[in-house]
């Protein structure tokens, strides 16, 4: 497979995905050399980039990202094969979900703590938690470490048409049209989870918004797409100054 097999700006997508990995590492969301981010580089979404197998996110560069085809059954036989879980999950997402142009799967501390509860629901108790009101899928049927393609298929089915999923006993995944959209959602999802964990830690009753207010706040978030792009671009400017090799 070569760059000529794709129809989108693969160079820019590589830079953005490498930036998302570096930024997530700086935030402390990564887990050793596991977890995985991917981004489609073809119009049908099936050709996608994913971070290289077991390379620490603080070191990943744009040129390191591995180009895969979701329909290529021989992918795991390649010398540069991605992590088995990355292939199982992301090949299914890019093959089955039209909204999965970008898929960020990770186990950040607060969201993963919330995923370990019997009820991992993010409740609308402030404006950030309300962003996700009625807009998340909840995968409540953890099937073990996702090294089998069947588990990836199950996860894709559980997500349905959502763009954000809380995966009980596992972690979270955000989807988007762009890396900026998916990363901004991930940032605010972890913030929302942190708010939930801190609120629960008080042992006091939560002040949950009414349905109408929560929906209004969520809609306001959806109307402010420009802020998502600005957020990601500002974070990339920090990398441009402090870790410019992410673009290499």
PLM region descriptions:
Residues 1-248:
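Glycine-rich flexible loops
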């Amino acid at each position: 497979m070569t760059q000529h097999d794709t129809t989108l700006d693969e160079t820019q997508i590589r830079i953005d995905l490498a930036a998302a990995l570096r930024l997530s590492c700086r935030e402390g969301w990564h887990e050793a050399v596991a977890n995985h981010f991917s981004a489609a580089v073809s119009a049908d979404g099936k050709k996608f980039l994913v971070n290289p197998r077991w390379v620490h996110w603080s070191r990943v560069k744009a040129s390191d990202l591995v180009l895969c085809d979701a329909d290529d059954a021989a992918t795991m036989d390649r010398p540069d094969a991605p992590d088995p879980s990355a292939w199982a999950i992301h090949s299914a997402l890019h093959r089955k979900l039209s909204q999965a142009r970008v898929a960020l799967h990770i186990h950040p501390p607060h969201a993963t703590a919330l995923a370990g509860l019997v009820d991992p629901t993010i409740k609308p108790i402030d404006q950030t938690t309300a962003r996700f009101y009625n807009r998340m899928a909840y995968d409540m049927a953890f099937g073990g470490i996702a090294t089998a393609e069947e588990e990836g298929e199950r996860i894709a089915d559980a997500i349905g048409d959502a763009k954000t999923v809380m995966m009980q006993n596992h972690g979270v995944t955000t989807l988007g049209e762009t890396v900026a959209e998916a990363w901004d959602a991930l940032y605010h999802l972890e913030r929302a989870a942190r708010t939930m964990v801190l609120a629960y830690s008080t042992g006091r009753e939560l002040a949950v918004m009414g349905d109408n207010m929560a929906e209004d706040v969520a809609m306001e978030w959806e109307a402010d797409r420009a802020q998502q792009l600005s957020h990601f671009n500002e974070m990339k400017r920090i990398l441009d100054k402090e870790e410019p090799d992410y673009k290499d």
